[in-house]
Every structure is written in structure tokens, then in C-alpha cells.
């Protein structure tokens, strides 16, 4: 019963993976336009989300995480990191700055810092909020953030389109590994969207089996002689450098202390939508 009341009493913070969320809004809705011909699909999705805060979920604090311009340590580690991202549709680019300016006008705080990606900002805020004993809701469906899911400390992802919580069970159901094992899993399978090389020839099933057997990437390589399948062993030996590089690339930095003055992140009480009308 005590733990029940503890959870009821817990303060909660909502962290939005802003670009990820806006991209998804854009592709989820038909290409809407205003009567002047300005594209509005992404902005409509964003407003629906803001209107749902308090209805779809309750939160005490809220923050919008953004990518900083320029490169990060990942580009220094690996020149090709995110090098082949497809071109972003013009309509989407037109709406992004408007959405960001609305976030600020509505009185929400933006988390951005040079050298950090939005995912690193999310990881940093989640870590500090967890240490404060908060419930942490990360608005994103991005698998790169699955490593942060932590049922024991009430850290989970929230898919705003499906209005669905993504917890440890959902992670295991989808990928066959726990959130704590997710970095090692990604290091093996790689990620074509971000140009993470992974181990060439190792797919999801093999990665799951290896992690189930050995737990971590380091442990896999320490026990390389115990791997029965000759082909898998060969692929791992050939891909060792890429595996460890990939692990560095997918590991989120969580050392950017951003919420020391937590009151700045209180959810505004007034109707924020009126501020942009």
C-alpha cells in the first residue's frame, strides 16, 4: 500500500523529444493547408498534443528537448554519423520554426545545449528527475530512447499518436531484450537511419540470442570462443571495431544537468494556446 501512495504522490515530469514528435505529427496527418496556402499539418498535430496535456496525461513539469545546431562528439567519433539522412520535405521545414516559436510563446521551457543531441538532453533530464524521485514520461516512440526505460523508477516512453505507454514489457515484446540490454543490442544490429554500422551480417534474431546468452557486448567478446556457430563467430571477429564504435555512438550522454532549478519547468496553469492566437 505504501508504494501505491508513493506513486500517487510522486511528482511527474514530461520530456518531449521535440523534432521526433513534430516529424511524426507531420507524417501522421494529411497535408493540411491554411486558406492562404501555408502548410499546417505539423502545427495541427502539435496543437492537438498541447490541448491533450492534462487530459491524456497529468504532469507537474514539462520540457521540450531540441537538437543544437552543429556537430557533436558522435561526428568526431565517426564521420559518417547521420550522413545519409533523407531530405526533409519543404512543407515540414516551413512549419518547424513556427512550432518552435509557439513552444516559447506558450511559456514552455526548451532544453538545448551545444554538443548535445536532443536524445542526450532527454537522457540527462530523465536521470536528474529520476534522482529527484519523479515519475518521468518521455514523449517519443524513438527506439534510441528505449535504453532509458526503467519500470522500477517510473521512467517510460509515451507514444502520443497511440496514447500508449512503452515500458519494459513493451520493449521486450518488440525487441526481445530489456531496456538495460538495448545499447548492446543496437551495437550489434546497427541502425541504417543514423548510419550506425553495427556488426555486418548480424541481424535482430542473432543479436537477441547473443545477448540472452552473454548479457553484454563486452561479455560476448570475452567469450567469443564459446560461440557455437562458426559464421557468427567470424562475423563478430570481423566486426569487433564497428561493434564497440556503435556502442559508443548509441550510448546517450546523461551528464548535462539542466533541471537544477526545477521550478522553471512547471506546467503553465493558464490556457497556453491563447498566447499564440
Model-predicted segments: where are they?
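Extended two-metal-dependent nuclease catalytic cores across DNA- and RNA-processing enzymes
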Residues: 10, 32-33, 83-260
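Long, highly charged low-complexity segments
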Residues: 272-277
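Short, Lys/Arg-enriched N-terminal segments with co-localized hydrophobic residues
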Residues: 1-8
Amino acid at each position: 500500500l505504501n508504494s501505491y501512495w508513493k506513486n500517487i504522490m510522486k511528482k511527474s515530469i514530461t520530456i518531449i523529444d521535440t523534432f521526433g514528435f513534430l516529424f511524426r505529427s507531420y507524417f501522421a496527418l494529411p497535408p493540411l493547408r491554411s486558406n492562404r496556402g501555408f502548410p499546417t499539418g505539423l502545427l495541427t498535430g502539435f496543437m492537438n498534443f498541447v490541448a491533450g496535456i492534462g487530459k491524456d496525461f497529468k504532469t507537474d513539469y514539462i520540457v521540450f528537448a531540441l537538437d543544437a545546431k552543429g556537430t557533436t562528439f558522435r561526428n568526431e567519433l565517426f564521420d559518417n554519423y547521420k550522413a545519409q539522412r533523407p531530405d526533409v520535405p519543404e512543407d515540414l521545414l516551413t512549419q518547424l520554426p513556427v512550432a518552435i516559436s509557439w513552444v516559447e510563446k506558450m511559456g514552455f521551457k526548451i532544453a538545448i545545449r551545444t554538443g548535445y543531441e536532443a536524445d542526450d538532453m532527454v537522457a540527462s533530464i530523465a536521470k536528474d528527475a529520476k534522482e529527484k524521485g519523479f515519475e518521468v514520461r518521455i514523449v517519443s516512440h524513438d527506439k534510441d530512447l528505449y535504453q532509458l526505460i526503467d519500470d522500477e523508477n517510473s521512467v517510460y516512453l509515451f507514444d502520443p499518436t497511440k496514447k500508449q505507454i512503452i515500458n519494459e514489457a513493451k520493449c521486450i515484446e518488440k525487441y526481445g531484450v530489456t531496456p538495460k540490454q538495448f545499447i548492446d543490442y543496437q551495437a550489434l544490429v546497427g541502425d541504417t537511419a543514423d548510419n550506425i554500422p553495427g556488426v555486418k551480417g548480424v541481424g535482430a534474431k542473432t543479436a537477441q540470442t547473443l545477448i540472452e546468452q552473454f548479457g553484454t557486448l563486452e561479455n560476448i567478446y570475452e567469450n567469443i570462443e564459446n560461440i557455437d556457430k562458426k559464421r557468427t563467430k567470424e562475423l563478430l571477429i570481423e566486426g569487433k571495431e564497428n561493434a564497440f564504435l556503435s556502442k559508443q555512438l548509441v550510448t546517450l550522454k546523461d551528464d548535462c544537468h539542466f533541471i537544477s532549478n526545477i521550478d522553471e519547468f512547471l506546467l503553465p496553469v493558464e490556457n497556453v494556446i491563447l498566447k499564440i492566437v
